[in-house]
């Protein structure tokens, strides 16, 4: 029984030493990040509220946009400036 208690105490001591070394490493990392940290602006955009041409194209092949007239050269593509599939649009 004494051996079991001694073994358990050694295991707990080993875990505590390991936890202390991990905590010290985390503190060193935070200190390094703060020293090298600069004011940086980050901009994240998930698209405009109206959607994009790729999203519109993904919704349906050959689907005409109700706000755009059909192309005079080909009847299957809309004449939208945002349509990525229309080869007739001047770019």
From Swiss-Prot:
Sequence repeats lie at residues 65-67, 68-70, 71-73, 77-79, 80-82, 83-85. GO terms for biological process: defense response to bacterium. Disulfide bonds: none annotated. It is found in: Secreted. Pfam families: Defensin_propep. This is Alpha-defensin 31. Belongs to the alpha-defensin family. PANTHER family: ALPHA-DEFENSIN 1, ALPHA-DEFENSIN 1-RELATED. Residues 22-55 are annotated as: Disordered. One of its GO terms (cellular component) is extracellular space. Apparent precursor of a secreted, cationic, proline- and cysteine-rich peptide that contains Cys-Pro-Xaa repeats. Unlike cryptdin, the proposed mature peptide region lacks the structural motif characteristic of defensins. It may have microbicidal activities. InterPro entries: Alpha-defensin, Alpha-defensin_N. Keywords: Antimicrobial, Defensin, Repeat, Secreted, Signal. Residues 20-65 form a propeptide. One of its GO terms (molecular function) is identical protein binding. Paneth cells of the small bowel. Residues 1-19 form the signal peptide. It comes from Mus musculus (Mouse). It comes from the Eukaryota. SMART domains: Defensin_propep. Residues 65-85 are annotated as: 6 X 3 AA tandem repeats of C-P-X.
